[in-house]
């Protein structure tokens, strides 16, 4: 998935099963001798000798209540006693990935928490996994806090882009290693399985214990393979095993998966986990859509070179209730759908799995999207904002990650490597717009039968306003703004100056969708780094007019996103 984040229509969210966001003593890079020799000091850490941190200003403090609480629960009555015991082990393993993500995103958590004097400060820092506001351009929240490093904790604080580009090390762009300085100041790689050896060993043990309790033999095999993968950083065998699973009622996503946290290059993956319960009845309703992927790939509005033969036929769609988020998936905006694995080789051979997170999705629709639509969608079109359209738009965003092109036409790199730090935003933008393209085509074929096409377009526009509130700093935020401004330039929607509400212009909206699909796929296929960078710099921004409209949502006290009450106690385990 790329984490749709939980953004655009996901968050989002979005995510490698090659490794799609609780607390314990954090001591980054202290797990092994090899690690301690190469570790650099944590970036932007708090000096324990300084006075307590205060809110940077009133505006920062006012944002402490932008998240609405939501209890993560699910019907576990069909699970055996063994499976319920297994769930507890999976949640315990997920909690450790939460610790790992703190190390990757910020550094020593306890040092920060000890300098925050109020529960409100600590809670908000916890939601952001650090002292920066993830849904407001990563702005500092507290006094004495500098700008968030683009490379988080993946790179040395003093490393420049130029220094990295000149670095002659194999796999320097790899997903599963840290860049550190050795004793002589030279850059070197430290694999995750060495850097985080202690925590990963514990996770591996927990997964092996859980496998012994699994009723489904394929799930048991996956847990064992994933346990091994975490200790070697070789995730492909477990990815294949994950794709082979079809009947398991319990699902787990765990490991270093998405690269959004690395805003310097977009190379390095961050740890996260999801523990999920499959909704078998809803999943059955979704089965048929996967079979249309090859046909939809052929119909993409670009020349054949930009739409190579469809990836593997093993792709599937399923609906789930999430019972636990941890690490990257729990930071800031919450993902509502996932598309995994990210490994292109696995995708080509077996396709991907699209996980629709039904309970989280319904929470965002009821608590956030409907109130937003009531403020910003014209009264005449408000009737078109529907949950089935929100569900479909979100679902096909994830499906659309599998469409398009993975490697540049020149054949010398992947799209991700060619577009560098712009790759994630373009991938999310592609998934958003191709998802809507798929909705349009399937509706025309009569395969989507609920409502009318205007429902999906109007709900899509309302969803942009929801996701834009996540800010324009994340990959999803930039993708949202690029699309909003592209559509605005083409009069795909109109703004009523008298009341500040928006209306979809149906035909122009559909035309803009087709043109943007073509343009994004072309930039990806060409590996055009400069154009991608230019687009995001000029179109991936929130202008003053839109900002004024979004301020109406703040005045109406509409939550920006949700946070979860979760864990074994909530589940009654």
Locate each region found by the language model:
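C-terminal motif of bacterial Sec signal peptides marking the signal peptidase cleavage site
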Residues: 16-19
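An active-site-proximal "capping" alpha-helix that borders the catalytic cofactor pocket
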Residues: 216, 424-441
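Active-site recognition of the HExxH zinc-binding catalytic motif
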Residues: 80, 392-406, 431, 436
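Long, well-structured alpha-helical subdomains associated
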Residues: 436-534
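N-terminal helix-rich structural modules
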Residues: 42-222
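Post-HEXXH active-site segment of zinc metalloproteases
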Residues: 405-429
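Contiguous, non-catalytic segments that form substrate-binding/exosite surfaces or channel walls
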Residues: 192-382, 386
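Bacterial signal peptide processing site
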Residues: 21-24
């Amino acid at each position: 998935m790329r984490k749709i984040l939980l953004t655009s229509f996901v968050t989002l969210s979005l995510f490698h099963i090659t490794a799609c966001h609780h607390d314990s003593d954090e001591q980054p890079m202290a797990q092994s001798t090899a690690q301690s020799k190469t570790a650099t000091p944590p970036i932007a850490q708090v000096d324990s000798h300084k006075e307590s941190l205060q809110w940077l200003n009133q505006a920062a403090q006012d944002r402490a209540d932008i998240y609405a609480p939501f209890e993560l629960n699910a019907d576990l009555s069909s699970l055996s006693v063994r499976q319920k015991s297994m769930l507890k082990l999976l949640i315990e393993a997920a909690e450790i990935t939460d610790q790992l993500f703190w190390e990757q995103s910020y550094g020593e958590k306890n040092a920060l928490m000890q300098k925050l004097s109020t529960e409100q400060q600590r809670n908000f820092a916890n939601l952001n996994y650090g002292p920066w506001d993830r849904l407001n351009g990563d702005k500092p929240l507290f006094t004495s806090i500098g700008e968030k490093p683009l490379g988080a904790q993946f790179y040395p604080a003093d490393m420049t882009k130029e220094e990295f580009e000149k670095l002659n090390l194999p796999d320097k762009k790899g997903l599963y290693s840290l860049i550190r300085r050795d004793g002589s100041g030279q850059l070197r790689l430290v694999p995750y399985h060495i850097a985080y050896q202690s925590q990963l060993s514990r996770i591996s043990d927990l997964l092996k214990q859980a496998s012994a309790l699994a009723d489904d033999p394929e799930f048991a095999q996956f847990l064992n393979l994933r346990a091994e993968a975490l200790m070697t950083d070789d995730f492909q065998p477990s990815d294949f095993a994950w794709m082979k699973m079809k009947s398991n009622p319990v699902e787990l996503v765990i490991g270093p998966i998405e690269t959004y946290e690395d805003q310097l290059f977009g190379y390095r993956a961050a740890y996260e986990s999801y523990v999920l319960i499959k909704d078998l009845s809803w999943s059955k309703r979704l089965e048929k859509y996967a079979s249309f992927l090859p046909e939809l790939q052929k119909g993409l509005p670009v020349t054949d070179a930009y739409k190579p033969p469809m990836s593997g036929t093993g792709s599937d769609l399923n609906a789930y209730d999430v019972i636990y988020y941890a690490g990257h998936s729990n930071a800031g905006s919450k993902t509502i759908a996932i598309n995994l694995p990210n490994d292109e080789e696995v995708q080509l051979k077996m396709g991907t799995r699209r996980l629709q997170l039904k309970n989280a999705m319904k929470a965002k629709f009821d608590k956030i999207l409907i109130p937003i639509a009531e403020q910003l969608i014209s009264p005449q079109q408000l009737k078109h904002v529907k949950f089935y359209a929100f569900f479909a738009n979100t679902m096909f965003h994830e499906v659309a990650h599998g469409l398009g092109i993975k490697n540049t036409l020149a054949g010398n790199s992947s799209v991700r490597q060619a577009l560098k730090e712009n790759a994630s935003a373009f991938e999310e933008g592609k998934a958003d717009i191709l998802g809507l393209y798929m909705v349009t085509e399937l509706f025309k074929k009569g395969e989507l039968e609920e409502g009318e096409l205007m429902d999906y377009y109007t709900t899509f526009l309302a969803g942009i306003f929801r996701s834009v509130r996540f800010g324009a700093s994340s990959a999803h935020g930039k993708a949202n703004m690029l699309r909003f401004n592209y559509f605005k330039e083409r009069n795909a929607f109109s703004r009523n100056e008298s009341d500040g509400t928006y209306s979809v212009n149906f035909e122009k909206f559909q035309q803009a969708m087709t043109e943007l699909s073509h343009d994004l796929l072309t930039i990806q296929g060409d590996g055009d780094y400069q154009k991608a960078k230019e687009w995001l710099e000029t179109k991936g921004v929130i202008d003053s007019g839109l900002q004024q409209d979004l301020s109406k949502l703040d005045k109406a006290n509409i939550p920006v996103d949700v946070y979860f009450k979760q864990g074994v106690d909530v589940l009654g385990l």
